Amino acid sequence: MFKFTGEDKGQLKCSFCGKYQDQVKRLVAGPGVYICDECIELCNEIIEEELSEEVDFELKDVPKPAEIKAILDQYVIGQERAKRTLAVAVYNHYKRINLGSKLDDVELQKSNILMLGPTGSGKTLLAQTLARILNVPFAIADATSLTEAGYVGEDVENILLKLIQAADYDIEKAERGIVYIDEVDKIARKSENPSITRDVSGEGVQQALLKILEGTIASVPPQGGRKHPHQEFIQINTTNILFICGGAFDGIDKIIANRVGRSGLGFGADIRSKQEQNVGELLKQIMPEDLLKFGLIPEFIGRLPIVVTLDALDEDALVRILREPKNALVKQYQKLLQLDNIELEFEEEAVRAIAKEALRRNTGARGLRAIIEDIMTDVMYEVPSRTDVTKCVITKDVVLKKQEPILVTTNDAKSRRTKKEESA
């Protein structure tokens, strides 16, 4: 007696495992292919297993707050409170992302960060270093170039394009990145009261940023620029992107001082002059109402729940910045001359003089490079051509009086050696 196979019966079969229709419970049809219920179940198991492995790896991969701060200490001098707050905020943010793939009754909300501090206090450096620690895509955007949709300038979606480019167009990777929006204080509305005229580069930009800060699926033009109807867009979910907004917020210390002064009136008030309370102390007392008075809209403030304040850098901090970090400027210039077999030495008084000049210019740590570059340009121009120079010494007079640095040559070394031999 003959036994008919599925093929003889003209039955359909699974394109993956080859089983016929009568050998499985269900066969799902696609364009020219079929898949059985057993293969579907196996695919689901493989995907779930891979996802759980990926999540477990990420949980182990995120450094603890103390580890994040320890690495920040290697690059950023001072700002202890700011580094602690940022370390905790970033750690919690990535814990929240990892929890998101698991079913849980507690939903953790997104916590974007607002950084306030004088120019050159380390806002951008902190954000860059965080991205390097976590090995995630990082993009810097300038809020002053943004305008409301439909006006000349950049759309807010162009910020996300920079992040996508930093992730080499890997959307999944970009969706876990960090975006630093600089000069966010420049998009404050021009007056405290709502305006009847359109403020396209101030309040309008704040309104446009609300959705991407909170979390939305944004349509990003792949080539940047303005959107137009006959264009394909890149879809990116901003729910798990950490936004750090930074700004100097010049003048907000006066707003805080006025509020603190009003609350301190009457008998038993702690009377302190403005000179006694420096800007750093005042910024630590910042409240949402101060940001509102400065010109940020309530919805924008609400989407930046973590406020980090940075102190102005003093002379000692600037001296440490010049010498201590891994990428310290003194170390960088020493390395540059070392490549020409020349030893570079900065005397302690010279380093102090550079720090004082940066304070005088009121440029913070950012101004240090300009001062050193001015000192070193002639040296770096002349010295590589001379084979007799072995050492270059930068003194206080080189910084303050624009004198020539001390160049130690092989002849000097020989004469010193001869004198030692003669005295012996």
Swiss-Prot record:
Keywords: ATP-binding, Chaperone, Metal-binding, Nucleotide-binding, Zinc. One of its GO terms (biological process) is proteolysis involved in protein catabolic process. Pfam families: AAA_2, ClpB_D2-small, zf-C4_ClpX. SUPFAM superfamilies: Glucocorticoid receptor-like (DNA-binding domain), P-loop containing nucleoside triphosphate hydrolases. SMART domains: AAA (SM00382), ClpB_D2-small (SM01086), zf-C4_ClpX (SM00994). It comes from the Bacteria. ATP binds at residues 118-125. One of its GO terms (molecular function) is ATP hydrolysis activity. GO terms for cellular component: HslUV protease complex. InterPro entries: AAA+_ATPase, ATP-dep_Clp_protease_ClpX, ATPase_AAA_core, Clp_ATPase_C, Clp_protease_ATP-bd_su_ClpX, ClpX_bact, P-loop_NTPase, Znf_CppX_C4. Zn(2+) binds at residues 14, 17, 36, 39. Residues 2-55 form the ClpX-type ZB domain. The keyword ATP-binding applies. NCBIfam families: clpX (TIGR00382), PRK05342.1 (NF003745). Belongs to the ClpX chaperone family. Component of the ClpX-ClpP complex. Forms a hexameric ring that, in the presence of ATP, binds to fourteen ClpP subunits assembled into a disk-like structure with a central cavity, resembling the structure of eukaryotic proteasomes. PANTHER family: ATP-DEPENDENT CLP PROTEASE ATP-BINDING SUBUNIT CLPX-LIKE, MITOCHONDRIAL, ATP-DEPENDENT CLP PROTEASE ATP-BINDING SUBUNIT CLPX-LIKE, MITOCHONDRIAL-RELATED. HAMAP family: ClpX (MF_00175). ATP-dependent specificity component of the Clp protease. It directs the protease to specific substrates. Can perform chaperone functions in the absence of ClpP. This is ATP-dependent Clp protease ATP-binding subunit ClpX. It comes from Symbiobacterium thermophilum (strain DSM 24528 / JCM 14929 / IAM 14863 / T). The gene is clpX.
